[in-house]
From Swiss-Prot:
Record's GO cellular component terms: nucleus
Name of the molecule in the record: Zinc finger protein ZXDC
Biased composition (Low complexity): 142-152, 635-651
UniProt GO BP: positive regulation of DNA-templated transcription
Stretches for region Disordered: 1-73, 85-108, 142-175, 624-652, 671-714, 727-751
Keywords carried by this UniProt record: Activator, Isopeptide bond, Metal-binding, Nucleus, Repeat, Transcription, Transcription regulation, Ubl conjugation, Zinc, Zinc-finger
Function: Cooperates with CIITA to promote transcription of MHC class I and MHC class II genes.
Zinc finger (C2H2-type): 176-200, 209-233, 239-263, 269-291, 298-322, 329-353, 359-383, 389-413, 419-443, 452-477
Protein modification: Sumoylated at Lys-661 with SUMO1, SUMO2 and SUMO3; sumoylation enhances the activity of the transcriptional activation domain.
Cross-link position per record: Glycyl lysine isopeptide (Lys-Gly) (interchain with G-Cter in SUMO): K661
Organism (species): Mus musculus (Mouse)
Gene: Zxdc
Length: 858
């Protein structure tokens, strides 16, 4: 029976062996269907129809079942002769790779035939009934059974195909069994067993070839891969790139071939400017940006944003910044509030919390790990020295492995410093973010350490170290390096705003901390020392820093000046400290001759005679005074002193007005009053020019006085020690010697000269006064009734000696000593004299005022 219309494909029939049944093979024709449950009709013809020869054009064979699990059934139509005998049995084996397990014997005409065959590891039920040959999937991979009575009711679509089953080897063929204990499968060929072993989960089954080196642990599926792996231990790279100039080597030929593909594509994209070639168009576009300034055609449409971009992808990435609030992926780790616009970025961020770094650099002796593949690839550029980002500035030539590094480098060519330190008080700026990061670590390390503040009152800069503060003072405030330790010393003086009375104006533009210091610069105890100095009546004024706070009135270079010493003020022991009285400069009107009082005699003096010890640094007279500019800051409120007119005649330097008030006794000496009337001005008390040394009588008379004004070129530790010792002795003695000293005091005036042995004042005579400061400073009231104003020029005739310095009292300007004016604030230490009873009848002397000139102070 021919059914050419329903044939699936032509099939060839194999050679017959000994008149036996022919082996049916699958034809090469197209299949009629591919869906599950679809039937295929095949026409099979027996050898009796046309003789023993093969008839390939008439014997189609069934195709193997499709891979879908659906229980495909194959209906094979056979033309079987009526008088078929037993030797006409057919062995149905459609596929050459399948081995039949049962031979289906030919039955008599009209009899039913059933059996089981295995095709591609799948058991099929074979039924031949009344000329119709049926193949159907078995319900389960069970042993083959020949039960014709149970199989007629089996429908083709009711069976489920099973892919796994033992491969039965044909008789006489070697069998390769699976070595797994729970697997009993066997295969006819070795490569089939290898493929089957890959399905098992054990390491031995998947990778049986282990590396023999200790500590390696690698295993492979084939011996070739193990051999290739062993070459990596020996650092062997036998496969070299043949392209000239490349020189790269590889461990396998596969890696070499993959590398060669890159060389083949290098010449595909060529730059028209520099003729450089690139493997991809994207790399060519990236390269061309270095030749031309790229256009930015893509502009952000968000309201208020005017940014433009080169590519669309860059614009899209920017747009996410405007819509981050709409969809954000927040980190769920406790204490972390970071948000990301993509889930993949959040996933990478979470690895920073978990410590997972799955991407490891395989370079030699590197071992760096990363949270993402992009960071690993970026890191590998360092090993390959891939500096693809080159600075476009002509003459620079620097290249970088990362684009952000090039961007940060480009800022250095602009000369700007956009990165500013956010710490309050720190104004440091940097051109690179990395420099700011390094700088910020200093603030983190010095959180608990005290900060050094600039000692200049108008500057609020803070510094982490004293070295930085000193460099700032020298660079910004033009101070000398040797003055910085004196500026650092804290001042125990009360600010001028607290000391000034309602009728006085506050000091302006003067830094008291820079002018005065209560302790030496190298002293370690500042607070305790200042309290002790105030209690003892001793205070040291550092006048070496005066020039830096006077606005340039003094020369900055003091090489031509003499040695500069501190100013030591020793208050009288009988006078309690008070902040409401002028500064006490002395307690007696006794005047000394030049060279008549030495430092050695000061130790033997009575403490009552030394009421105030003042050490002023003055310039050597042998040196020329530098040219000075008249000061515009000095004002003389009230009446103008007489010495001002005398000073202006020479035009050398202005005067620093320091009125000195001389309080007289109730019964002044007539000679003094007569001298004042004849001169109509300040008392002409001038130091004698005699250089003879006074005798013991003069010293005893000096010691009998109530006090004196003594000038010494001190300032060293020896001078301070003498001052302290004198005050201590004076406190121990008390005021007993002061009462008897007033009775023996005498005053004589001869030709306008006062001789120290014969000139004495009363018990309550003293030098007190108020220093005048620049404009806006302290005001000096007009001389009250009963007060005399004298002019005291400070001179130094013998600076190299150890003797005392002379003090001249004269209303006239010295012809051979130039004056030197210093704008010196005075709120240092104020003392007041206790007014004794009967101190009401003071004689009034109307004197406009006078000055004290401090020369060569810096």
């Amino acid at each position: 029976m021919d059914l050419p219309a329903v044939l699936a494909a032509p099939a060839t029939r194999g050679d017959q062996h000994g008149g036996g049944p022919s082996r049916l093979r699958r034809g090469a024709g197209p299949s009629l269907g591919a869906g599950p449950g679809r039937r295929r009709l095949l026409l099979l013809r027996g050898p009796e129809d046309g003789g023993p020869g093969p008839r390939p054009e008439e014997a189609p064979g069934p195709s193997p079942p499709p891979p879908e699990d659906g229980g495909d059934s194959f209906v094979v139509l056979l033309e079987v002769p009526r008088a078929a005998d037993t030797h006409g049995q057919e062995e149905a084996e459609p596929d050459s790779g399948a081995s039949p397990t049962e031979q289906v014997p030919a039955a008599a005409p009209g009899a039913a035939l059933a059996g089981t065959v295995t095709i591609h590891n799948q058991d099929l039920l074979v039924r031949f009934d009344r000329g119709v040959f049926t193949l159907a999937a078995a319900p389960a991979p069970a042993a083959p059974s020949l039960h014709p009575a149970t199989t007629p009711g089996l429908e083709p679509s009711s069976a489920a195909a099973s892919r796994r089953g033992p491969v039965a080897a044909s008789a006489g063929s070697p069998a390769y069994r699976c070595p797994e204990p729970q697997c009993a499968l066997s295969f006819a060929k070795k490569h089939q067993l290898k493929v089957h072993l890959l399905t098992h989960g054990s390491l031995q089954g998947r990778r049986p070839f282990k590396c023999p080196l200790d500590g390696c642990g690698w295993a492979f599926t084939t011996s070739y891969k193990l051999k290739r792996h062993l070459q990596s231990h020996d650092k062997l790279r036998p496969f070299s790139c043949p392209v000239g100039g490349c020189g790269k080597k590889f461990t396998t030929v596969y890696n070499l071939k993959a590398h060669m593909k890159g060389h083949e594509q290098e010449s595909l994209f060529k730059c028209e400017v520099c003729a450089e070639r690139f493997p991809t168009h994207a790399k060519l576009n990236s390269h061309q940006r270095s030749h031309f300034e790229p256009e930015r055609p893509y502009k952000c449409d968000f309201p208020g944003c005017e940014k433009t971009f080169i590519t669309v992808s860059a614009l899209f990435s920017h747009n996410r910044a405007h819509f981050r609030e709409q969809e954000l992926f927040s980190c769920s780790f406790p204490g972390c509030n970071k948000q990301y616009d993509k889930a993949c970025r959040l996933k990478i961020h979470l690895r920073s919390h978990t410590g997972e770094r799955p991407f490891i650099c395989d370079s030699d002796s590197c071992g760096w790990t990363f949270t993402s593949m992009s960071k690993l690839l970026r890191h590998k550029r360092k090993h390959d020295d891939d500096r693809r980002f080159t600075c476009p500035v002509e003459g620079c030539g620097k290249s970088f492995t990362r684009a952000e590094h090039l961007k940060g480098h480009s800022i250095t060519h602009l000369g700007t410093k956009p990165f500013e330190c956010p710490v309050e008080g720190c104004c440091a700026r940097f051109s690179a973010r990395s420099s700011l990061y390094i700088h910020s670590k200093k603030h983190l390390q010095d959180v608990g350490t005290p900060k050094s503040r600039c000692p200049v009152s108008s500057c609020n800069r803070l510094f982490t170290s004293k070295h930085s503060m000193k460099a700032h003072v020298v660079r910004q405030h033009s101070r000398r390096q040797d003055l910085v330790p004196q500026l650092e010393a804290p001042s125990s003086l009360t600010p001028s705003s607290e000391l000034s009375s309602p009728g006085q104006s506050e000091l302006t533009n003067i830094d008291l901390a820079a002018l005065f210091s209560d302790t030496p610069a190298n002293s370690s105890s500042s607070t305790a020392g200042s309290d002790e100095a105030l209690n003892s009546g001793i205070l040291t004024i550092d006048v070496t820093s005066v020039s830096s706070s006077l606005g340039g009135n003094l020369p900055t270079n003091n090489n031509s000046l003499g040695p500069m010493d501190p100013l030591v003020l020793v208050a009288h022991g009988d006078m309690p400290p008070s902040l409401d009285s002028p500064l006490v400069l002395g307690t007696s009107a006794t005047v000394l001759q030049p060279g008549s009082f030495s430092a050695d005699d000061s130790q033997a003096m009575s403490t009552g005679a030394v009421g105030c010890l003042v050490a002023l640094p003055v310039r050597n007279l042998n040196q020329d005074s530098p040219a000075l500019t008249p000061s515009n800051n000095l004002t003389a409120p009230g009446t103008t002193p007489t010495s001002s007119d005398t000073t202006q005649e020479t035009g050398s330097v202005p005067d620093l007005l320091v009125p000195i008030k001389v309080e007289q006794d109730l019964s002044p000496v007539p000679d003094v009053v007569q001298g004042q009337k004849e001169s109509h001005g300040p008392s002409q008390s001038v130091l004698s020019s005699s250089t003879e040394r006074p005798g013991a009588q003069k010293d005893s008379e000096l010691s009998a006085g109530t006090g004196s004004l003594y000038l010494e070129s001190g300032g060293s530790a020896r001078t301070d020690y003498r001052a302290i010792q004198l005050v201590k002795k004076k406190k121990q003695k008390g005021t007993g010697s002061d009462e008897g000293a007033s009775d023996s005091a005498h005053r004589k005036v001869k030709g306008g000269t006062i001789n120290p042995p014969h000139v004495h004042s009363g018990q309550h005579s003293c030098f007190c006064g108020t220093l005048m400061v620049p404009s806006g400073g302290l005001t000096v009231p007009a001389p009250a009734a009963g007060l005399q104003c004298v002019q005291i020029p400070v001179l130094q005739d013998d600076p190299s000696g150890e003797g005392g310095l002379p003090l001249g009292l004269s209303p006239q300007r010295s012809a051979f000593h130039p004056y030197f004016t210093v704008d010196l604030p005075v709120y240092v230490l104020q003392e007041v004299l206790p007014a004794p009873g009967g101190f009401a009848g003071l004689e009034t002397a109307q004197v406009p005022g006078s000055t004290i000139n401090l020369r060569d102070l810096e």
